C-alpha cells in the first residue's frame, strides 16, 4: 500500500526513515515534502518496506536543481528521484513499490512517469567523462545496478543529462551525469 506524505494516514515521524536514503542522503526531509514534492511510504502487511521521493511537474526534470524548483501548479508528469528499501525490507520490494506509485499518480490524472536516476558505477568503467552515446551503450549493457533495476522493471532510457547533479556523491560516481528512465502505463 502506498501512503503519500500529504495524506492523513502518513505519520510524520516516518520522515526520520529518510536517513536511510543511499541515493540522496544530504537532502533535508523538509525539502522532500515542500511544493509539489512528496514522499511515498510503501507498506506490505505491517512493515514499512520502501520510500519513494517524487515531484509532480508540468514537464520532464533533467537535474536535481530543477527537482527543487517549485512548479506553479501540479502537472501531468511524475518524477521519481529516489527509491530505496528500508532496513529489513523484503527483496524485490522496489519494483512492487514503483508499480504502486505509478498507479497512485495515475489515479490522480498524471500521465507521464520518469525517473531522474544516478549512474553510480560510471566512473568505474570510464577514465574520462563519456559521450552521450557511450553512456547509452553502458546503460543498455545493464552493468550499472540502477540501470539493471529500471530496465529490468520495464523502463526505457529516455535521456542522458550532463551536469545534472553537482553533489560530491554524483561528481565522484559519474561526473554529475544522471539519466531519465521512462515508465509507460
Predicted region positions:
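Extended, composition-driven regions rather than compact fold-specific motifs
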Residues: 1-91, 95-185
Amino acid at each position: 500500500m502506498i501512503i503519500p506524505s500529504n495524506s492523513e494516514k502518513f505519520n510524520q515521524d516516518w520522515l526520520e526513515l529518510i536517513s536511510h536514503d543511499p541515493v540522496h542522503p544530504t537532502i533535508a526531509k523538509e525539502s522532500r515534502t515542500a511544493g509539489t514534492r512528496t514522499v511515498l511510504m510503501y507498506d506490505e502487511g505491517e512493515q514499512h518496506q520502501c520510500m519513494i521521493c517524487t515531484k509532480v511537474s508540468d514537464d520532464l526534470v533533467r537535474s536535481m536543481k530543477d527537482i527543487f524548483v517549485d512548479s506553479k501548479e501540479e502537472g501531468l508528469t511524475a518524477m521519481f528521484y529516489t527509491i530505496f528499501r528500508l532496513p529489513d525490507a523484503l527483496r524485490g520490494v522496489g519494483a512492487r513499490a514503483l508499480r504502486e506509485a505509478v498507479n497512485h499518480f495515475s489515479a490522480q490524472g498524471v500521465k507521464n512517469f520518469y525517473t531522474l536516476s544516478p549512474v553510480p558505477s560510471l566512473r568505474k568503467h570510464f577514465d574520462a567523462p563519456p559521450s552521450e552515446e557511450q553512456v547509452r551503450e553502458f546503460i543498455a549493457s545493464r552493468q550499472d545496478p540502477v540501470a539493471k533495476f529500471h530496465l529490468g522493471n520495464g523502463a526505457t532510457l529516455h535521456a542522458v543529462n550532463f551536469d545534472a547533479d553537482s553533489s560530491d556523491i554524483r561528481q565522484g560516481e559519474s561526473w554529475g551525469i544522471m539519466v531519465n528512465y521512462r515508465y509507460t502505463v
